[in-house]
Amino acid sequence: MKSSTTQTLIFTVFLLLIPTSFAAPPKLKDSFTQCVTVFKPSVPIQNFTYTQQNPNFLTILNNYVRNLRYFNGTTRKPVAIVAAAHFTHIQATINCAKKLGLQLRIRSGGHDYDGMSYLSTVDFVVLDMFNLRAIEIDPKLDTAWVQSGATLGEIYYNVANKSNNLRGFPAGICPGLGAGGHFSGGGYGNMMRKYGLSIDNIIDAKIVDANARVLDRSSMGEDLFWALRGGGAASFCVVLAWKIKLVPVPEKVTVFNVETIGNRGVIPTDLAAKWQEIADKIDNDLFIRLTLSSSNKTVKASFMGMYLGNSEKLLEIMNAKFPELGLNKTECIEMKWIESVLFWLSIPPGTAPTSVMLNRIPQKQIYLKRKSDYVQKPISKPGLESIFKILSENENVSMAWNPYGGRMSEIPATETAFPHRAGNMFKIQYSSNWFVPGEEAASDCLSQTERVFEAMSPYVSKNPREAFLNYRDIDIGKNLNSTYEEGKVYGVKYFKNNFERLVQVKTRVDPDNIFRYEQSIPVHVSR
């Protein structure tokens, strides 16, 4: 069996080396353009449709490519990009993709780590949602309608301003993430122990289905609404907008970031062991992420946290539950919740206005690979020492350990399509970033990631080895033939026992498999 590193390279090279002659013929591009025009959307679609002949085509395509591995001139290009500005543009795109036999890729923020929202091995169209970014807040009801093309930064900024900094929303720490994909995969962040995931605070949605109908929660039915929350909406429909429930945040939160390589009088593995004991059981208002990274053969443990309250109460909790860290008053920074968003971006307090989170242009572009795991039992001290050793030998890889517990353990695994609830201590994100183009650098970094991932196998969930959909990972399986059997390989890892229900919903609402991609939910074909 080929290693997942080899599989990743084969898949990537296949995408990169498709010759120009294998691109869609001009006739197909013309046919699509004519088709969406004939459909006569309410708002003229011509100015929002880009084919390869359009001088702005590559700019539009690359604006939301967030992984430099796919930012080049040799990846297969879509037949067209529709930068939808009205729901009728989406209806026209769906109908014309069906008519012409084109696959559809739906992109809201472009953060699909393995590029599945803008890549394909067959003729395809990209439905780009970045123009659909409206945010309508109802401060009396503490709700908001958020279009899928809005970014988390735009949501946070508007919610804070509209609520006088007394409301927030539980979602990710990266302001550039698009709401469409982030929410539909679950949407986790540093308030999940208090309020759960984004999907646990979504109360309605407006979609366009496979028949180009505009539906809401009532008209789509509870099964499909269930699937959209954690099951990856791109397998079922196009989400126009989400109705979210805003959550209370205090006037001040307290943040800290303690980095140690043994310089606090405690061995880092001892601190990691203690973190395991308390991180998923501590006060629900407190989230402490442990990040492990290595340089010069030395592993650094970083404890980055946020408490929904003042520093005095935080120190009281830490002194009682985690005194080994030695957190002190000078390391605690009180700020508004909206300001904490910048802190998690490593922007020093007071050095930038909160409006910086409205910037859609990334601070930097990188080549990257991400993977995920779930830990359900404490890792022994010898196990931690082994992990630190493998990290010290693969210095391009870091791990972020994100604690669960709290509200996450209270919500049943079947409440939404997202199954990773009670029984999980923490989730791991494996990160490998590099800045040098070329196959040699990519192969080295992917190999390092795979070595660390394999070394972790004794300590993580099994049968299946669970994975987080928002950390998209082509290594765990791909469905190039649109079969149930291929889909189940990765499906049970992302969705566990919820996979079969997702297949049932998919088969009912999209029997022709219009919404498909390399890791979509498959249709169950009766025999």
Curated annotation (Swiss-Prot):
Main site of residence? secreted
UniProt-listed InterPro entries: BBE, FAD-bd_PCMH, FAD-bd_PCMH-like_sf, FAD-bd_PCMH_sub1, FAD-bd_PCMH_sub2, Oxid_FAD_bind_N
Cofactor requirements of the protein: FAD
Cross-link type 6-(S-cysteinyl)-8alpha-(pros-histidyl)-FAD (His-Cys), residue numbers = 111-174
Which UniProt keywords are given for this protein, alphabetically ordered? Cell wall, Disulfide bond, FAD, Flavoprotein, Glycoprotein, Nucleotide-binding, Oxidoreductase, Secreted, Signal
Alphabetized PROSITE patterns for the sequence: FAD_PCMH
Which EC numbers characterise this protein's activity in its record? Answer: 1.1.1.-
Per the UniProt entry, the disulfide pairs are 35-96
Pfam families per the UniProt record, alphabetical: BBE, FAD_binding_4
**Which SUPFAM superfamilies does this entry report, sorted A to Z?**
FAD-binding/transporter-associated domain-like
* Entry's Gene Ontology molecular function annotations: FAD binding; oxidoreductase activity
Give the sugar-modified residues. Answer: 47, 72, 161, 296, 328, 396, 481
Q: How is the cofactor bound?
A: Binds 1 FAD per subunit in a bicovalent manner.
Instruction: Provide the FAD-binding PCMH-type domain boundaries.
Output: 74-249
Taxonomically, the superkingdom here is Eukaryota
GO cellular component, alphabetical, reads: extracellular region; plant-type cell wall
Q: Where in the cell is it found?
A: Secreted, Cell wall
* PTM summary: The FAD cofactor is bound via a bicovalent 6-S-cysteinyl, 8alpha-N1-histidyl FAD linkage.
Signal peptide range: 1-23
Question: Would the keyword Nucleotidyltransferase be found if you checked this record's keyword annotation?
Answer: no
Q: Return the broad EC class.
A: oxidoreductase
Please report which protein family the annotation says this sequence is part of: Belongs to the oxygen-dependent FAD-linked oxidoreductase family.
Q: What is this protein called?
A: Berberine bridge enzyme-like 14
